[in-house]
């Protein structure tokens, strides 16, 4: 039986708390008192992440932005760009971090796919020692699930070279 209790905090307030965290980059426990308690905000964040709402929201925003920026433009891009970025992370709280020997960074690596207007289409985060081809393939798999029907060219640097990724 579904839970029909009335919410104590509005979803808008929870989203505002998540936007605050994103903008300021602070710890969950340091949320100001104007927002709900951090365990509740974190609960909704993880719940929406698990059911794919963040990805669906991003996809809808990209399509809407492309339509409103230039009405003659299609919802789906034709060209995308794939690249990796190594980022440092804290010593605690991250299980799958590694060392990127090339950039000498201990942390994680994010593979980002953006369109030519720099709008995020797909992302994959893995340990820093993960090969670009492995992370790129995971990011491309996420991109394929989004159904950008016109996308036919993804540009990438030499780190993504090789036959397995091209297929």
Where do the protein language model's features map onto the residues?
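Short alpha-helical elements
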Residues: 1-167
């Amino acid at each position: 039986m579904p839970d029909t209790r009335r919410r104590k905090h509005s979803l808008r307030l929870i989203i505002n708390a998540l936007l605050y965290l994103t903008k300021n980059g602070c710890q969950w426990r340091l949320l100001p008192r104007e927002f709900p308690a951090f365990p509740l905000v974190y609960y909704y964040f993880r719940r929406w992440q698990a059911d794919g709402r963040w990805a669906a929201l991003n996809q809808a925003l990209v399509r809407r932005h492309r339509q409103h920026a230039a009405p003659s433009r299609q919802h789906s891009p034709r060209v995308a760009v794939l690249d990796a970025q190594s980022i440092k992370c804290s010593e605690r709280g991250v299980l799958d971090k590694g060392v990127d020997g090339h950039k000498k960074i201990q942390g994680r690596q994010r593979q980002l796919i953006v369109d030519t207007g720099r709008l995020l289409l797909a992302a994959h985060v893995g340990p820093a020692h993960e090969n670009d081809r492995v992370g790129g393939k995971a990011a491309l798999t996420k991109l394929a699930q989004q159904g950008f029907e016109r996308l036919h060219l993804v540009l990438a640097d030499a780190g993504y070279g090789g036959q397995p990724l091209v297929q």
